[in-house]
A protein has these predicted regions:
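Short, small-residue-biased leader/transition segments that mark boundaries at the very start
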Residues: 1-7
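Cationic, amphipathic, low-complexity alpha-helical segments enriched
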Residues: 8-9, 13-17, 23
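N-terminal amphipathic/basic leader segments beginning at the initiator methionine
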Residues: 39-71
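Conserved beta-strand elements of the Class I
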Residues: 77-78, 134-136, 177
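Short, Lys/Arg-enriched N-terminal segments with co-localized hydrophobic residues
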Residues: 30-42
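N-terminal small/polar loop signature for handling phosphorylated ligands or for N-terminal nucleophile
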Residues: 89-158, 167
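Small-residue-rich anion-binding loops in enzyme active sites
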Residues: 59-102
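A glycine/threonine-rich phosphate-anchoring loop and its flanking beta-alpha core
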Residues: 155-190
Length: 190
């Protein structure tokens, strides 16, 4: 199972279909109209508050260690995807910044698009074993989403997949920082 499948299961496809229904000339079937009406009835009111500090600019990755230290992290999981962060030297700069700030870390790479649950489970176990209290995701949306899933899995008992299937509500999550490598991810602010 991939975490990208969660989007499809939890309304992404329905939301997309709902948007298509507003296209002039698009015809809705009776079944589509009933589904949309039922979804509207089931909507829940909510407040959304998600403060996010964004540090932007050339060379800001060199501040990673200091920024993580501001969050009072005592041990960090550096979570990343493909070899591009290694080849570019970015991962080494992150490691150096953490070392200069005196913050111990462990690493877990190998995130692929639509992250695999097996890697999330591996990350959860690594974080628990190493007493990690902060996750630093270095990459794009899939790395960030995988890091979030690991954060929820560490902070809550049971199977992290239950949260994605809405069987349980998460009580917390490890703090997560991001060194974003792609401008279009969007995952970094939620």
């Amino acid at each position: 199972r991939g975490l990208g499948d969660v989007y499809k299961r939890q309304g992404g496809i329905k939301s997309h279909q709902r948007n298509d229904d507003h296209v002039p000339g698009a015809e809705k079937t009776g079944a589509q109209s009933e589904i949309i009406e039922q979804e509207i009835k089931e909507m829940t009111n909510f407040d959304y508050y998600a403060p996010t500090k964004v540090v932007f600019g050339k060379g800001t990755e060199d501040q990673a260690g200091d920024l993580v230290r501001e969050q009072r992290a005592t041990k960090v999981l550096v979570h990343y995807g493909s070899g591009s962060v290694k080849r570019s030297g970015l991962l080494d700069r992150i490691y150096q910044s953490l070392e200069q700030a005196g913050i111990p870390f462990v690493s877990l790479g190998g995130v692929v698009p639509n992250p695999r649950l097996s890697l999330v489970y591996q990350g959860i176990e690594l974080c628990k074993k190493e007493h990690v209290d902060f996750i630093l995701a270095v990459g794009g949306g899939s790395v960030i989403d995988s890091g979030k899933a690991i954060g929820y899995g560490v902070a809550n008992e049971g199977d992290v997949w239950d949260f994605y299937e809405r069987k349980r509500v998460a009580a917390g999550c490890l703090p997560i920082g991001v060194v974003l490598t792609i401008a279009a991810a969007g995952s970094e602010t939620v």
